[in-house]
Structure formats: C-alpha cells, structure tokens
Amino acid sequence: MKIRIRILPLIFGLLGVLTAAAAVTAALRSLNAPPYLLEAPESASDCADNLMQCICQGDYLQAEQYLQGTPDLELNRSPEDPVGVLLWDAYTSSSSYTLIGGLYATETGLAQDVRFEALDLDAVMKSMDTLAKELFTAGIESAEDTSAVYDKEGNYREDFIQDTLLSAARQALADNSQMTETELTLQLTHQDGHWLVTADQALFRIICGGITG
C-alpha cells in the first residue's frame, strides 16, 4: 500500500505534465493555422459555393454576379464551332470542386480554400495540334478528288479544315483522359451588402480551361 501511495502522485504528476505539454503544442500549432470563424456569414459561404457551381456548369454569365470588378471577359460567350463545343463540353462535364475547411478571416475580408479538378484541357489541345497536322496531311494525300480539299480559288475548303479539326479533337479526347487538380483561395470582400469574390490569376485559369497556350 505504501508503494501505491508513492506511485500515484507520480502518475498524476506525469499526466499533468503531458496534458500541459499537449496544450502548449496545440497552441503553437494554432499560431500557423488560419483563423477559422466559429460562425461564418452564410451569405459569404453561399457566394463561394455558388461561384464554383457556376464554373463547373460552364455558366459564366451567372458566375459574373459573384465576382468583384469583373473585367470584360465576355464570359457569357460560348464556343460556336463544333470543335470548340466538343472541347468545352468535355471540360465542363469533367469539372468538380471541394471546399477545403471553412471560411477564415483575412486583412481584406474572408477567404475560402478550394480544390478544383477537371480534364487536362491543355494536354488535350497540345495533342490535338499534333494530330491535326497528321490528319491534315493524310487527308490531302488520300483525297481522290482535289475538289474535296481545295475550293475554286485554290484555298483549302472550310469544311475540309473543320472536319479534320473535329476528328483531331475527338481522337485527342479519346487518348487523353488525364485530370488536373488546382488548389486556389477565393478572396471574398463585402461590398454594397453583398459578398463578392475578387478574381485572381488562379481563378481566371480554371475559367479559361487551364490552357497555357
């Protein structure tokens, strides 16, 4: 019994030290963590969520209402040619996003971290460029009648060009299914009673399909 009396204080003392050490460690770690809000404004969270939904749906006209000081990007314009429609549909249909953590305070307002995933359209475009040149040459060489390739002025027929590009786009999409992941931070500011996202290069990049040129 005497042994237990001596050991118990030691055990409780050790537990106290460990608890204190854990508290200090947690406090130190929290210094480097973003100041997450216990009760974030629902309208700010909705703004970030709705913007990303619009981007994933390819509804850029609707997305504009959640952006602050949007430059003239003509986001409401959709591709009109078959190749553009095919590529853009493939990109938007593959798009998805995840809100990482919650809103946290910044010097200018609030911020929300986001993980965005979509088809690597940049890789598809580069593959399409190579394929188009190969198919273009093959189409000319295999044509039984030059009128299928050239018009009366000796220029390449527009339908021949478009058919070649469309074939190249389809093959490039079939050969390239790689996804690309982007992590970005949406910066939100309160303006005229509404929360708006300040667009930056990372956001513009996913809006433009991640194409680098």
For the regions a protein language model found, what residue spans apply to each?
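Short beta-strand edge/turn micro-motifs at domain boundaries
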Residues: 134-156, 172-213
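A short hydrophobic beta-strand element
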Residues: 108-118
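Short Pro/Gly-enriched beta-strand edge/turn motifs at strand-loop
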Residues: 81-85, 164-171
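Short, cysteine-centered beta-strand-loop-beta hairpins and adjacent loop/turn segments enriched
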Residues: 117-135, 176, 208
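Residue-level signal for tight coil/turn positions that link beta-strands
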Residues: 105-109, 192
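Hydrophobic alpha-helical membrane-insertion segments, chiefly the h-region
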Residues: 17-27
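N-terminal Sec-pathway targeting helices
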Residues: 1-17
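Core segments of small alpha/beta cavity-forming domains
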Residues: 30-106, 123-125
